[in-house]
Every structure is written in structure tokens, then in C-alpha cells.
A protein has these predicted regions:
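Catalytic phosphate/nucleotide-handling subdomain of diverse soluble enzymes
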Residues: 395-397, 404, 538-602
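Glycine-rich phosphate-binding/hydrolytic loop that grips phosphoryl groups
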Residues: 342-343, 354-370, 519-523, 575-610
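Glycine-rich phosphate-binding loop of actin/hexokinase-like ATP-binding domains
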Residues: 218-222, 227-255, 319-332, 366, ...
Length: 642
């Protein structure tokens, strides 16, 4: 039986027994070796590169591997089969598609600004930021031969007196450790739980000094998971962190994940990837950072798209992508942390923001709540740019929503040098029209070199190439120069960082295929907006606000986004970047009982438009797949300098 050794950059080698003919990418997945494969192994993205160090692989040529690179040993793992013992080098993808766990510096005002803004917005709408979770310290007389009251009755009496309730519930998971905790603390303890009318439901009995009651709000993105811990009494953010979604190795988009979970054992693999590999380690890390215990987490909330919600709870997601596109659930009540084996209080409710449709999920419901458009007279667009594109239009009188198949281009997928907005990502760019020389802004320290390009950088680069007349309306190169190179097929590319200027020693560039992929992604966004407006018989001029959310990069240049025809050509002052609205909405849900109820109300009142069956959408999409559009009258401010 052959052995394959994966030499992981920056990590320990992993040795795997396998069979002749095994696919190398599938073998890496079984061994829990992270290889970047946004297309889930269909050969289209070219990102699952590995280097053959020793032995042989059966692999076929690819347009993504040059002859020189092939001679050096570079292969695509998705198109390589095992023929015998071999050793392969696996590049570190942590800085690109998967990010290592990061804990935010809460001393930075930027890290907590979106939560303060969300709380202020909801309070103005009459939402009270209160909940019914409580921590109370009680002291009881210790039992004796003269006082034979059992522990549960002793605690019940103490809580009834302290809280003024008529009934106390002590669930099994609390009861089984009650005797030990009471005696360990000489019957002086802190009790945490939830007030339910005249009843107090105990959730935790612990040492008297442990009075923290904590909420956990989570945004589960297709690419990235972000989480905050908050004090359920004050609303203060205790810790914030993020990590790459462990499911990324099964594909960058939800369709590939759905296909993968439909394979034998796939649902369990995808659920483990999000729970065991992603959520649970972040929770443990943030609790340690905040100095609180995991059982102190008394309520959790989740903002996630419909597919992520299904994969989280382990429900088959096949119906999400199958006609008539009806998911297994929109709203899920009664879910507890113990049901998912999450390291929180086992009785902690897990509130999942309701889904609207197959491709408009709870992340959009939570984001709509946070944006405040549901309580505004102004007609507003809410656009979430992540691995997919979701759009909501309306005001307090109506809300209509849709999702478009933008693909993962906004987070670096489908782009040869694309990556998330992490260290080394080019996030902004200008180009000199005469010299064609770029000036870039790179995420990271001052001496950070370029690794790739994130979504906001891609928008800038394409807009600048079009403005300078370097590419035409189809995204094809029409000027030559040192920065414009062509391969042996004649395909052009623009080099932003030469080999000696990059972090990896490989050039960072954008080619005609990348530009075409992004044009289709931006075309999907614009045509979805146009279709939503058409569905309610509203002109572009009716738009009073445009709220942009998502992981595309906080430095998104709205002018450039309009210039390439991604957003409608409205006054720039109408645009507002609101950050991770799914997370801020989830924060509101976990902190406020009224906000949680309002989220369900917003979902119930929102109309979902299925674009795949909507008349005229495809014609609108095709027309939008140019820079900026086939009808340039729609973009009077789009600039292409002569």
C-alpha cells in the first residue's frame, strides 16, 4: 500500500496510507490536510497547487501550470493520482483563503464601532436592549441533623426569596452536580439562569465569584467565521475573533458544499468542519481571552446563509439547490448548545436568524435588522457582498429580497491571485494612465509585500484599467507595456507586483479570465438590483440610501464600484459601508429579547424573489456583463479617459 507524505509549509508532515489511483485532493481531505480548492476539485480554479518533491504522480497538464512550473514539480492536486510512494509539498494557504484564528484588539474603537452603532440604531427604533438572563449570589444555611432540607429545596427557597419568583426549575444537568458545588463553596454560590415569567430556570450553579453571564454572537460566512462574546447585562464586547471556515476545503461556494454533503458521510464531515474544527476552538479561545468560563455562555445567536444553517445543524441541504428550491427549514426554534455539542452552557438557547429563501438566509435577516431599513421611511438598498451576493430593497412599508450567483469572486475566488482581505492582500490601487504603473495599498504592516488581491482591490484595479484605456468594455487588454504581459495563447494579464516585489516570489497579476469572471460577478449584482427595482416598479432615482456590507474589504471605493457597473449610478453620498452586518445583527439578537423577536418579524414580512425563474433576469444579466454596461446611459458618471 503506497504512502503519501504531505509536507505542509510551516507545519508538521502528515503521512497517509492510500491506494494506487487515489485522487490526491481527496486524500488530503481525508487526512485533514488543508489544500486550497475553491472549485472543489473540478479543475477550474487552479489553486490546489502542490509540489512533487519525491516519487511520481499521475497528472495531466493544466492551463494553470506553466511548462517551467511543471518541470519544477508543481501539479494540481485535483488532477493528480497516486501511483506509488511520494512526498508532496503543500503551500501554506492560511494567509490566503483560510485564515488562522485571530483575536481582535478591543482597544481599537473600530472593532466595537459596528456594535455600538447597531445598538444605537435599534434603540432609536424602540428596541430595548434587555434580556431575562440573570446571575444571583445566594447564601444558604448548611444542612445539619436539625436542618434536613434536601439540596434542591434549599436552593429553590433561596432563589424564590432572592428573585421574588414563584417557581424554580433545576434541570438534570444542573442537579447532577449540585451537591458537589454547594459543599465545595460552603453553600455560598452564584446561580445563573433565565427568568421565564414567574419562573426562574437554573442553568449553572458555580463559585460565588463567577458572576459573568455571557452571550455569544456568530456570523458563519461561507469563507470566514467571526464571533463575539458579550456581557449579557451591560452589552460590553468581551472578546472578538475569527477564523477561516473549516469547510473551505470542500469548495468556496455553497453549491460545491451541498454536493459534497450529499456524498456518503458528507453531511457529518461538513458539520464536523464547522463545529469541531471552527466554532468550538474559537469559543474556547475567546473564553480564555475574556477570562470567562464556557458554561457562562447562556445564549448564542447565529447569522448564516441558508446552506450554512443546514450544514451547521446536520440537515440535508440538497433541497436548497433543487427545483423548486425549498429548504428544509426557515425558522428553527428550541435548539440548544448541547444539541450541537458546543462548548457553552448545555442549556444555552441557540437562536438561528430565520432564512428567507434558498439563497437569502439568516445572515441577510440579521443584516437587515442591523441596517435599520425595516424601520425607515427612506427607500434603501441593502447589499451583502460575500461569497454570494444578496440584496434587499424597501423601507418600513415593504421589503423585497433576492440572491444572485455572483460566485466567490468578491472574496478572491475565481481570481488567479485572489485572496481574502488578510495580510498581504492588495486592497486598493490606482494606475498612472501614462506609465501604467500601479500604486497599491496592502493589508498588514508597513513592510508587508503583496501576496494576492482581495475584493476591494480587484474592483479598484479593474476600474483603473478601464479608466486608463488599458482594457476595453469586454475586459480585454488593448494597450501594451512592461506591466502588460501575454502568455503563449495570447491571453493578456496586468502585473501589479513582479516576482521580486511579492511576498511569495511569484508575480501578483490579474488576467483576462480573472476580469471576465469578475465582470460576470459584478453583472450579477447590478442585474439583481435592477430586477428588484423592476419588481416593485421603482426607478434607480428612487434609491435614497445604499448600505453595503460583507467581507469584500472596508476600504471599498464606491466610485470605482459604480465606474465598472457593479452598483447603480447614484450620488456617492448615498453609499454607506456598514461592515459585518450579519454579526452586528446576531449581537443584537443575543443581547435583546425584543431584537430577537423583531428579526423573526422582519423575515416574515420580507418577500423573496427567485431570480432563476424571474422573467427577464437573464437578459438583464447578459447586458450587465460589460464595463460598465451595454447601455452606458445607465452610468453617466463612468469614466474611460481618451
Amino acid at each position: 500500500m503506497p504512502k503519501v507524505v504531505f509536507q505542509i509549509e510551516g507545519g508538521k508532515p502528515v503521512t497517509v496510507d492510500c491506494n494506487v489511483g487515489d485522487n490526491l485532493l481527496e486524500l488530503a481531505r481525508r487526512a485533514n490536510v488543508a489544500i486550497d480548492a475553491p472549485c472543489s476539485g473540478n479543475g477550474s480554479c487552479g489553486k490546489c497547487r502542490i509540489k512533487l518533491v519525491e516519487g511520481e504522480l499521475e497528472s495531466y497538464p493544466s492551463r494553470h501550470i506553466s511548462d517551467e512550473e511543471y518541470a519544477e514539480g508543481w501539479r494540481l492536486s485535483c488532477s493528480s493520482k497516486v501511483v506509488g510512494n511520494c512526498t508532496v509539498f503543500v503551500p501554506d494557504i492560511a494567509s490566503a483563503y483560510q485564515s488562522r484564528m485571530k483575536t481582535a484588539d478591543l482597544s481599537s474603537p473600530q472593532e466595537v464601532a459596528i456594535f455600538d452603532a447597531c445598538q444605537s440604531q435599534l434603540k432609536q427604533s424602540g428596541i430595548h436592549f434587555t434580556n431575562q438572563f440573570r446571575a444571583v449570589v445566594v447564601t444558604m444555611a448548611e444542612p445539619s441533623l436539625d436542618d434536613t432540607m434536601p439540596d434542591n429545596e434549599r436552593l429553590t427557597w433561596a432563589l424564590e426569596e432572592a428573585l421574588g419568583v414563584e417557581k424554580v426549575e433545576i434541570p438534570f444537568c444542573v442537579m447532577v452536580k449540585l451537591a458537589h458545588v454547594l459543599r465545595e463553596n460552603s453553600f455560598h454560590v452564584c446561580v445563573k439562569g433565565e427568568l421565564l415569567g414567574d419562573t426562574f430556570r437554573c442553568m449553572e450553579v458555580c463559585a460565588p465569584e463567577d458572576t459573568a453571564i455571557v452571550g455569544c454572537a456568530i456570523d458563519i460566512g461561507t469563507t470566514t467565521v467571526t464571533m463575539v462574546l458579550t456581557d449579557l447585562t451591560t452589552g460590553k464586547i468581551l472578546a472578538k475573533g475569527s477564523s477561516g471556515n473549516g469547510q473551505i476545503r470542500y469548495g468556496a461556494d455553497v453549491i460545491n458544499r451541498i454536493i459534497e454533503q450529499g456524498k456518503p458521510g458528507g453531511r457529518k464531515k461538513l458539520q464536523d468542519a464547522i463545529l469541531k474544527e471552527t466554532l468550538n476552538p474559537i469559543i474556547a479561545n475567546l473564553c480564555k481571552s475574556a477570562g470567562v468560563t464556557c458554561p457562562s455562555i447562556l445564549r448564542m445567536s447565529v447569522g448564516a446563509n441558508t446552506t450554512m444553517n443546514h450544514l451547521l445543524v446536520g440537515v440535508d441541504a440538497q433541497s436548497v439547490r433543487m427545483d423548486p428550491y425549498i429548504p428544509s427549514f426557515f425558522l428553527w426554534n428550541g435548539l440548544l448548545a448541547q444539541d450541537l455539542k458546543i462548548p457553552a452552557n448545555p442549556l444555552a438557547p441557540v437562536l438561528i436568524a430565520p432564512n428567507i429563501g434558498s439563497y437569502v438566509g439568516g445572515d441577510i435577516t440579521a443584516g437587515t435588522l442591523a441596517s435599520g431599513i425595516w424601520d425607515s421611511d427612506a427607500l434603501s438598498l441593502f447589499i451583502d457582498l460575500g461569497t454570494n451576493g444578496e440584496i434587499v430593497f424597501g423601507n418600513r412599508d415593504f421589503l423585497v429580497s433576492c440572491a444572485c450567483s455572483a460566485g466567490p469572486a468578491f472574496e478572491g475566488g475565481d481570481i488567479s491571485c485572489g485572496m481574502r482581505a488578510t495580510d498581504g492582500a492588495i486592497e486598493a490601487c490606482t494606475v498612472d494612465k501614462v506609465t501604467m504603473e500601479p500604486t497599491v495599498s496592502i493589508v498588514g504592516d508597513a513592510d508587508q509585500k503583496a501576496v494576492g488581491i482581495c475584493g476591494s482591490g480587484i474592483i479598484d484595479i479593474i476600474s483603473e484599467l478601464y479608466r486608463c484605456g488599458i482594457v476595453n468594455a469586454k475586459g480585454l487588454f488593448i494597450r501594451e507595456g512592461e506591466r502588460v504581459r501575454r502568455d503563449h495563447h495570447g491571453m493578456g494579464r496586468y502585473v501589479i507586483a513582479f516576482e521580486n516585489e511579492s511576498e511569495t516570489g511569484r508575480e501578483v497579476s490579474i488576467n483576462e479570465v480573472d476580469i471576465d469572471n469578475f465582470i460576470r460577478a459584478k453583472g450579477a449584482i447590478f442585474s439583481a438590483i435592477a430586477t428588484l427595482l423592476q419588481s416593485v416598479d421603482m426607478p434607480v432615482e428612487a434609491i435614497e440610501n445604499v448600505y453595503v456590507a460583507g467581507g469584500i474589504g472596508s476600504g471599498i471605493n464606491m466610485k470605482n464600484a459604480v465606474n465598472i457597473g457593479m452598483f447603480p449610478d447614484v450620488e456617492l453620498e448615498k453609499f454607506h459601508y456598514i461592515g459585518n452586518s450579519s454579526l452586528s445583527g446576531a449581537y443584537a439578537m443575543v443581547m435583546s429579547d425584543e431584537a430577537a423577536a423583531k428579526t423573526a418579524e422582519v423575515a416574515a414580512n420580507m418577500t423573496y424573489l427567485e431570480l432563476s425563474t424571474y422573467p427577464g433576469y437573464m437578459d438583464s444579466f447578459v447586458a450587465a456583463c460589460f464595463l460598465p454596461h451595454t447601455d452606458k446611459r445607465l452610468f453617466p458618471h463612468s469614466i474611460q479617459e481618451a
